[in-house]
Amino acid sequence: MATLKAVVFDMDDTLLSINLSAFIGVFALDEANLLAQVARKPIVSLFSPLGSAMLALNNGDRAQGDTRTNRQFFADEIERRCGIPILEPAIADMLDFYEREVLPKKNDRTISARPREGAHEAVQTVLDHGLRIALLTNPSFSRSCIECRMGWGDMLDMPFELVTTWENSTRVKPSADYYRDSLAKLGLAPEETLMVGNDPKRDFPSPSIGLKTAYVGAGYQPHALWSGSMADFAKDFDRIEERFCNGE
């Protein structure tokens, strides 16, 4: 019989309800504007390289031996594509200030970020069962940017043992290496852990590593241990844990 030791959660549209496309649009436009000012370039000249660099990061098309953090990978792509060294201290500090002090104020009716129904109850139920928790959000953003969204979801005080960011990760979802590396930092095996997420692609490791997923997205996922709404997760958790331990 398997033993469940930890539950690891996705964030966007799992614990946090958010119009992610709107958020990315605002974030990308603001950062492009800042970099355009630094480089003294027209802002429109940065849209393509910024988008291409982010796409390259999220495509995960990297050599097996590439050990750069996602932050370093993105910075290298930006410098190669438009000549801006975003890790230089003055530029890095400017971007960090924006993400810590300005971005949190950008939540509006369009982005509409707020705790997802049932999210806090889900986390508390897992903790009440004596299990460990971590936040395995896709690490294609900085710690500051991720903490901004955690704040919108009232998650900053949750006792996550790990939050994956582009500073501490070398791959993105759904890479099996991303999941393996994240669990290794926690001292956990995939067979001891339950993933909770809404994305039918990114929240299922590829290739499979034996990590089971409770799916809280739209529709039904035949490969999930359990499918349902975030609001139902806490109510069904005893049954979910039983199915996990029975190897279903």
Explain the meaning of each model-derived region.
Residues 22-31, 66-79, 140-141:
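Short acidic alpha-helix initiation/capping motifs at coil-to-helix transition points
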Residues 1-52:
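Active-site neighborhood of HAD-like aspartate-dependent phosphohydrolases
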Residues 15, 21-22, 60, 137-141, ...:
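Short histidine/acidic/glycine/proline-rich micro-motifs that form metal-
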Residues 52-103:
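A metal-dependent, Asp-based hydrolase signature
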Residues 36-52, 80-97, 156-160, 191:
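Short, surface-exposed acidic
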Residues 20-23, 27, 115, 145-148, ...:
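Residues at alpha-helix caps and immediate loop-helix transition turns in enzyme cores, especially N-
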Residues 1-7, 120, 124-127, 136-141, ...:
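Asp-based, Mg2+/Mn2+-dependent phosphohydrolase catalytic module
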Residues 66-69, 92, 96, 103-134:
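Short, acidic loop-to-helix structural element flanking the phosphoryl-transfer center
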